[in-house]
Curated annotation (Swiss-Prot):
Pfam family name, one: C1_1
Protein name: Rho guanine nucleotide exchange factor 28
Annotated region (RNA-binding), positions in chain: 1493-1524
Region described as Disordered: spans on this chain: 288-335, 483-525, 709-761, 774-799, 1186-1207, 1574-1598, 1612-1700
């Protein structure tokens, strides 16, 4: 939540906006409140919803400059407020606040120059003041004005004739708003006419300054105005303030620690919505202020006397005259008439018996006759806080025809909200565009006449009407009325209709049959709106004949709201109406017999002033009505009828259905996940097929039947109704139904039937409504019948049916609220919530982690649901329905509100994180971080809060369960629990189950956090947060367990103390007696207890209860179901833990020795336990208790009873004497005040009007501090001196009277001036201040100072007017008498205090020796030992201090050395850093150079590669040339062939040997050679280069040849095989490798010779193939064996020739 402002002035009144996150939606039908929590005050202000996530409110004023916590609470109907967010606002003290405080304090000290001097401390100029005009008004509005403060500075009616006032100051500063505000304050009207010391009025100043606006306002001013704010004090801690400028109502509560937030919000809502009551209350508060604060010309002395007496002149007039005078319209003296009306209402409120006598008088007119009144509302109320005994509100009165009456009921007809310029006493005429109202018959209203009330009415109407509409949609009006007709006829008079209340509901438009609206005066804690609507009875208006037939129709209405907050108020509305005396028919609906209204109840509220017979007649009338209501006939009829229809109500109509989304079974509360499911066609309930028998009954059928059986009446619902035709005249039924309760959703909005009898369904509805109203309006005591029994009797339904009705009526809004959050987390896991495609993209650990986080949020929702069930279903029902005491309910549900608030805040934090983690849509989310929320929840303030509330809740678990079982013995409570358990909202969880679930909740957190931690990556921030959160949770659980254990031990200790016999005791070793009373110290606590065995001297064992306390070990023995101190071997059963040693018993694993080494004497006990573990546990706990036991023994042992009784008796005697002396002092002060009063009366009788004496002493008897009499004595001495001066002055005046202008006058003046010097006010003030402040009445110093100042002023006047010396002397005597009497009272009180102090000192002195004597030598020895030990410890402390100082100096030296080393290291590091920087720069330069060289190298490498490619091309060219040369040589050597014999064996062997020696030789047959030659000699027709390949041959053959050559080279170990392969290859079509085409087959011989002279590289020859020389040598050795194979070649095949 973000606030739009962070700093505001103290007076507030700034608009603030609270903006929530985008995912937060603020419901439109909810209420929002801003809570401002300060250190001493809390303010509650309503907020408006301006957007979906934005709230607007007005910041209230605050009295202290501090930072307050601002929280926003959501309040919906039906459950507790929820805190949605919080922030902070700082209140600052600005210049306007300081200037306002200065104006209030300096109001009576102003001078004509104050408008300049007051601005000096603020450094302000007159030109800058207009900007502060409005802020000054707001600051003054917020200030708490002193009691009796006025604009003139004091509350006295006697003011100076010439005086500067705040109005003069406002005019001089030209501040019109401040001027208007001051004019509304007390004394403002008087100050308007008061001239200042310059004889100038505010009007003259305005004229002189040219302030035309102020001049016009002053000239048109006709009386006192109402200020812009109203403040109402509810009690000493709560105050309501209404600001008309902002139309804001603020509730301010002091001592926020003592008030619950929920209670403060309910209190605010109570007054905010009950507007009629608030208008009257604020009006009475304004009148009280006017009665106590004089305001000037508008109030005369007679009016003040009327206000004091509580009566007004109008009370003596007749009612008819009063109505007539009001109907005549506004007179010339409008303000005076308004004041008279104010006093009339005020006197009517203050009169104790007025409402009762008025009610009785009106009711007694039923049998005796009287004026014809159609509707007269009498409201009898009790308001505890404001002491208003009753409120009589009378509204609009009209006399209309049937047509005009229908027009008044139109939507725009009657408006009680006055426009701002409308006088509150003006006529409120009901007008319509289609229908006209008879002007002669129209009458004016009787509304509260003051402008204060009207303004408040207007502002409330404008501000709260929109919110009221939403509540009117939800709540129906309730009307309790009974109809009976009058018994006698009377004369017909014009009807008068009074509309109740101060504000009319905007909803009208009723049908013409029986037109009736309701008055809802409920003041229940939830939102209640006091609505008043027009009341009309068409039966009296249907024809003109009914107006002239002499029929008398009367209506009596007594309305009262339901009980709220323990205050009971009686509500009964009776309306008696009939059309004629002959047409009488009584038909009343009846509640159960236990709800009958007795006649005695009405006697307490209605006290008639008529004769006794009339009283009995009225009582019989009411008794008759009540008896008709409780007739047993209709009850039996309805019971039989409901029994027959019972089965039909419970049946569903299930149909098979398929559902999209996740739904819940209504029978087993499990999720419907794709199983075969059923759905009811009526109520849409979903269930499994196997659970259909367990589903609760169908609510839709019940609702239909309930709606059919509704009474055909109008109950003030807000729905639009059909108006019947105007020509149809309907006579209503004499019976008038009782309305449904305000919380019910359904309203009966149908017209009456024409029949005058009431059917059974109407009786049933009537009985149900009466039951609801009675159950809600009962007192705090338990009713005899439960709500469930009444519903069973009225409707005859089963408990399950009733539970559904209860859900629909009471818990529907709460159920929708719970289900909204539950639907999001009702799936079984996270993987089922998100989209499958989104889930499949996540890792396995992420899915498992999200499942656990989802489970954490899901279980948190369930926990909040459990808490809400406990709060709203059980606790609220116990308080409202069962009317249980709040303390009893809080014992069953301790700390429930705090638990709910804490867990809601925790869940909202997780929910907000879930919304922030959404990706793509709202369904897909991955929460990556949850540890920070867990750490925040379980650390700091939240952790301490959870420890406290869970500690309290778990500690009181057993107590709550025992109290619940005790309450279950009551049948009424059993029925209540049965109904609540059957509620769907409770989910079949009872109170024990809910309490157990809450206590187990904190144990679930560690398991869930450990599982989240298991799937979180280590060494991450989230992992660290989760580890920390896990530790915090475990610490919290341990703290809760410890608190529960301590509470249980404390409870057990209290139980044991209660079982200890009061008279039991034991004697200690030092001779002191130890009794039970010594155990009741708050410092002692139970550490451990258990049953042990004390071994006696004879070897026997005695069962003993051992109690280990904080300072002693106690052994108790049970006797007659009581505990006494154990008596074994005459040893004391109380062992001090000081110097107690526990040792094991040798050869006994279950025994231990307890050795007490006390100074009084050692003692040893042998104690045995049941097991070795138990003994070890005892020894360990005793050792821990000894270590933590305090060392001092004083105060642990008990004193003797005799000494204690004596001391108590002396103290009681001293207190008694002190009370007697205080009473005597009070009587003395009273007698002295009575004497002063008598003297004052004697002074008035003596004829001296100028003499004035206050008949009160200057001190008050204070039992705490005695008054200081020194100041009173000094004042009395100065008063005596002034009296002496006055006497001398009178004598000298008598002597010097003949020669007034002579030298005696100068002598007199000198004498007076010399004698006046010691008694000057300055010297007096300094003397009193030098003595310090007085501990007496705070007004004493001011009064004494005023006396001295007045004396000084009178002495100044004595010099000028010597004729008044006698009055001055008498005045001085009176003042001196008052001072002397005050001094006497002070001395009396001081004497009493002195005597009491003497007795106290004697008591202390008498107790001191006894204490020292009781200690004896043992205590002296102990003291000396402790002193010695103390000295040793002190010496050790000094030694440790010296060592500490040495270590500290050594540490300082070490620190200095380390600091120097660090500085040197730092300087070296800085130098090293500079060197590194230079090296880095050098390296960068080298790197740039290397980069440049690399670039050049790459360029050179590219050029080298290009050269290599050129060399390769050149080398290829050279190969081509070599091939050409070889071809030429081959052609040239054909003439020189080498001839071999084909069959020579030598040649063959030689060829094989040569072929093995030459690896790169080629064998070409003559066929290939001839083919090549022939091919080379042929022309090339295409011009393409010649190819050495045969026609049709592929390049693959060359590859095969090369492979064959490589095989020959690698495997020379098998010459035969290789040779055969070579021959085979040589016979095949082989071709040289890489031969290019030959353009010219013959080259010149020079090229050939040059080629032969070259000697190529062996590597190149290997790569290129066989060299020419090798080929030549091979050619010489080639055998001619191929001649036989080439015989087919022709003639040339005789020899084989190999050519190069």
């Amino acid at each position: 939540m973000e606030l739009s402002c962070s700093e505001v002035p103290l007076y507030g009144q700034r608009t603030v906006y609270a903006k929530f996150g985008k995912n937060v939606y603020l419901p439109e039908d909810a209420e929002f409140y801003f809570i401002y929590d300060g250190s001493h005050q809390r303010h509650v202000v309503i907020a408006d919803r301006v957007e979906d996530n934005v709230l607007q409110s007005i910041i209230p004023g605050h009295w202290l400059q501090e930072t307050v916590m601002v929280s926003v609470c959501l309040c919906s109907e039906g459950y507790s407020p929820v805190t949605m967010g919080s922030g902070s606002v700082t209140y600052v003290d600005n210049m306007a606040c300081r200037l306002a405080r200065l104006l209030v304090t300096q109001a009576d000290r102003l001078t004509p120059c104050s408008h300049q001097t007051l601005l000096t401390p603020f450094a302000l100029t007159a030109e800058a003041l207009p900007a502060l005009d409005e802020e000054l008004v707001l600051a003054l509005t917020q200030l708490e004005l002193p009691l009796g403060w006025t604009v003139l500075g004091n509350s006295s009616l006697e003011v100076c004739l010439h005086r500067e006032s705040l109005l003069h100051l406002a005019v001089r500063w030209a501040l019109p708003k401040l001027f208007h505000f001051l004019l509304c304050l007390p004394g403002g009207v008087k100050a308007l006419e008061l001239p200042n010391e310059e004889a100038t009025t505010p009007l003259d100043l305005a004229l002189h300054g040219g302030h035309s606006m102020l001049v016009e306002d002053i000239s048109n001013f006709q009386g006192r105005r109402s200020p812009g704010f109203s403040r109402l004090r509810l009690n000493e801690d709560a105050t309501l303030q209404f600001d008309r400028s902002s139309e804001t109502l603020t509730l301010t509560v002091n001592h926020t620690a003592e008030h619950l937030l929920e209670a403060d919000i309910k209190l605010f809502r109570k007054y905010f919505w009950d507007r009629a009551f608030l208008v009257k209350a604020l009006d009475q508060e304004a009148k009280t202020e006017r009665a106590t604060m004089p305001s000037g010309a508008a109030e005369t002395e007679e009016e003040v006397r009327n206000l004091e007496s509580g009566r007004s002149p109008s009370e003596e007039e007749e009612d008819g005259q009063l109505v007539k005078s009001q109907a005549d319209g506004p007179s010339e003296q409008e303000d005076q008439d308004r004041l008279v009306l104010d006093h009339s209402f005020d006197g009517l409120k203050k009169s104790k018996h007025a409402p009762a006598s008025l009610a009785a008088g009106q009711l007694s007119d039923v049998p005796n006759g009287g004026d014809e009144v159609y509707a007269n509302c009498m409201v009898i109320d009790q308001v505890g806080d404001l002491d208003i005994n009753y409120i009589n509100i009378e509204g609009l009165s009209t006399h209309t025809s049937p047509e005009s009456m229908r027009s008044t009921l139109g939507p725009q007809a009657c408006k009680h909200i006055l426009p701002p310029d409308t006088s509150p006493c003006g006529h409120l005429l009901c007008e319509d565009s289609d229908r006209t109202l008879d002007a002669a018959a129209s009458q004016s209203c009787m509304s509260p006449p003051s402008s204060h009330t009207s303004n408040l009415n207007l502002s409330f109407g404008l501000h709260g009407f929109v919110k009221e509409q939403s509540h009117l949609k939800k709540r129906s009006s309730s009307l309790d009325a009974l109809v009976a007709d009058s018994e006698e006829e009377g004369r017909s008079e014009p009807p008068i209709c009074y509309a109740v209340g101060s504000q009319s509901s905007p909803r009208t438009g009723l049908p013409g049959g029986d037109e009736l609206d309701s008055f809802d005066a409920n003041t229940e804690p939830d939102c209640n709106i006091s609505r008043t609507e027009s009341l009309s009875l068409s039966s009296t208006l249907h024809s003109k004949e009914s107006l002239l037939s002499g029929i008398r129709s009367r209506s009596y209405s007594c309305s009262s709201p339901k009980i709220s907050s323990g205050k009971s108020r009686l509500v009964r509305d009776f309306t008696v109406c009939s059309s004629s005396e002959e047409q009488r028919s009584y038909s009343f609906q009846e509640p159960p017999g236990e709800k009958r209204i007795q006649e005695e109840e009405w006697d307490d509220y209605i006290i008639p002033a008529k004769a006794e017979s009339e009283k009995h007649k009225v009582s019989r009338t009411f008794s008759f009505l009540m008896n008709r209501m409780t007739s047993p006939r209709n009850k039996s009829k309805m019971k039989n009828k409901d029994t027959k229809d019972k089965e039909k109500l419970n049946r569903h109509q299930f149909v098979p259905g398929t559902f999209s989304g996740v739904l819940q079974c209504s029978g087993c509360d499990k999720t419907l996940l794709g199983k075969e499911s059923l759905q009811c066609a009526n109520c849409k309930a979903n269930t499994h097929k196997g659970c259909k028998d367990t589903v609760p009954p169908c609510t839709k059928k019940f609702q239909d039947k309930y709606n059919k059986n509704k009474p055909q009446t109008i109950l003030g619902s807000s729905s639009v109704r059909d108006v019947p035709p105007p020509g149809l005249s309907l006579h209503p039924s004499p019976s008038m139904p009782i309305g449904l309760p305000a919380g019910r959703k359904e309203t009966a909005g149908q017209a009456h039937p024409l029949s005058r009898s009431v059917p059974g369904t109407t009786l049933e509805s009537f009985r149900r409504a009466v039951t609801s109203l009675e159950s809600e309006g009962d007192s705090n005591s338990w009713r005899s019948r439960s709500h469930s029994d009444e519903l069973f009797q009225s409707m005859g339904s089963s408990p399950s049916t009733e539970s559904f009705m209860m859900e629909d009526v009471v818990d529907s809004s709460l159920w929708s609220e719970l289900s909204s959050d539950a639907q999001e987390f009702e799936a079984e896991s996270w993987s089922l919530v998100v989209d499958p495609s989104f889930c499949s993209r996540q890792e396995k650990d992420v899915i498992k982690r999200q499942d656990v986080i989802f489970e954490l949020m899901q279980t948190e929702v369930h926990h909040i649901q459990t808490l809400l069930i406990m709060s709203e279903v059980f606790r609220k029902g116990m308080k409202e329905e069962l009317q249980l005491d709040h303390s009893t309910v809080d014992r069953i549900f301790p700390c429930l509100d705090e638990l709910l608030e804490t867990h809601k805040h925790f869940f909202f934090s997780m929910k907000e994180r879930r919304q922030e983690s959404c990706t793509g849509n709202d369904r897909n989310f991955v929460i990556n971080q949850i540890g920070d929320i867990l750490v925040q929840q379980f650390s700091e303030e939240n952790a301490s809060k959870m420890k406290r509330i869970y500690g309290d809740f778990c500690s009181h678990h057993k107590e709550a369960m025992s109290l619940f079982k005790e309450l279950q013995q009551n049948k009424k409570f059993q029925n209540f629990i049965k109904i609540r358990n059957s509620n769907l909202l409770a989910r079949r969880r009872g109170i024990p189950e809910c309490i157990l679930l809450v206590t187990q909740r904190i144990t679930k957190y560690p398991v869930l956090v450990e599982r989240i931690l298991q799937y979180t990556k280590e060494r991450t921030e989230e992992h660290r947060d989760l580890c920390r959160a896990l530790g915090l949770i475990k610490d919290m659980i341990a703290a809760v367990d410890l608190k529960v254990s301590e509470y249980e031990k404390n409870q057990k200790w209290l139980e044991i103390l209660n079982k200890i016999e009061n008279k039991t005791y034991t004697k200690l070793k030092n001779g002191h007696v130890f009794r039970k009373q010594a155990l009741m110290s708050q410092e002692r606590a139970l550490l451990h207890d258990g049953l042990v065995y004390w071994k006696t001297a004879t070897g026997r064992f005695k069962d003993i209860l051992a109690l280990l306390l904080t300072d002693v070990l106690l052994f108790l023995q049970e006797k007659d179901q009581k505990y006494i101190f154990a008596a074994v071997d005459q040893k004391p059963s109380v062992i001090s833990l000081q110097k107690l040693i526990a040792r094991e018993v040798a050869n006994e694993e279950r025994g231990m020795f307890l050795i007490s080494a006390s100074s009084a004497g050692p003692e040893m006990y042998e104690i045995h336990t049941s097991s070795k573990e138990e003994r070890n546990n005892w020894m360990r706990r005793i050792q821990q208790a000894v270590e933590s036991c305090p060392e001092e023994e004083g105060g642990r042992t008990s004193e003797s009873d005799e000494e204690r009784r004596k001391a108590d008796a002396r103290v009681a005697k001293i207190q008694q004497c002190q009370e007697i002396l205080s009473n005597q002092d009070q009587q003395i002060c009273t007698y002295l005040e009575e004497k002063l009063h008598i003297y004052a009366e004697l002074g008035e009788l003596s004829g001296f009007e100028d003499v004035h004496l206050e008949p009160h002493l200057l001190i008050k008897p204070d039992p705490g501090e005695p008054p200081q009499a020194a100041s009173l004595l000094a004042a009395a001495l100065r008063e005596a001196e002034s009296l002496q001066v006055a006497v001398k002055a009178s004598k000298l005046a008598d002597v010097s009277q003949p020669s007034e202008e002579g030298p005696g006058g100068a002598v007199l003046a000198d004498t007076l001036s010399a004698q006046d010097a010691p008694a000057s006010p300055t010297a007096f003030t300094e003397g009193t201040e030098g003595r310090g402040c007085w501990d007496v009445d705070p007004r004493l110093q001011g009064v004494v100072t005023d006396l001295a100042v007045s004396d000084a002023g009178e002495k100044v006047e004595y010099r000028s007017f010597s004729g008044s010396s006698q009055s001055e002397i008498i005045q001085a005597i009176q003042n001196l008498t008052r001072l002397l009497y005050s001094l006497q009272a002070a001395l009396t009180i001081q004497d009493s205090h002195i005597e009491i102090h003497k007795l106290v000192l004697q008591q202390q002195e008498s107790l001191a020796p006894s204490h020292s004597f009781r200690g004896g030598p043992l205590q002296d020895q102990e003291k000396s030992r402790y002193l010695e030990k103390h000295r040793e410890e002190l010496a050790n402390i000094h030694k440790l201090q010296y060592q500490f100082q040495q270590e500290q100096r050594r540490w300082h030296r070490t620190c200095d050395q380390q600091q120097r080393e660090q500085e040197a290291q730092e300087s070296w590091l800085q130098a090293r850093e500079r060197e590194c920087q230079s090296q880095e720069e050098l390296l960068l330069r080298h790197r740039s150079e290397l980069d440049h060289q690399l670039q050049e190298y790459q360029q050179n490498l590219e050029r080298l590669r290009e050269g290599q490619r050129m060399v390769e091309r050149e080398r290829q060219r050279m190969r081509d040339q070599q091939g050409l040369l070889g071809h030429c040589k081959h052609s040239r050597q054909r003439s020189l062939p080498a001839v071999f014999s084909p069959g020579s064996k030598e040649v063959t062997e030689l060829n094989r040997a040569e072929s093995l020696c030459h690896e790169k030789s080629f064998f070409l047959n003559d066929a290939f050679t001839h083919m090549s030659l022939n091919t080379s000699n042929k022309p090339n027709p295409s011009g393409a280069p010649w190819d050495a390949h045969p026609p049709g041959g592929s390049h693959l053959d060359l590859a095969r040849t090369s492979d064959s050559q490589i095989e020959v080279k690698m495997d020379v170990s098998q010459p035969s095989d290789v040779n055969s392969e070579l021959w085979t290859t040589g016979l095949g079509p082989q071709r040289p490798a890489r031969q290019e085409s030959i353009k010219d087959s013959c080259k010149n011989v020079a090229d050939l010779n040059s080629f032969q002279t070259e000697s190529p590289d062996p590597q190149d020859s290997n790569q290129r193939g066989p060299q020419p020389q090798t080929l030549i040598t091979e050619a010489k050795l080639t055998p001619p064996m191929a001649a036989g194979h080439g015989g087919d070649a022709g003639d040339g095949a005789e020899e084989n020739i190999v050519y190069l």
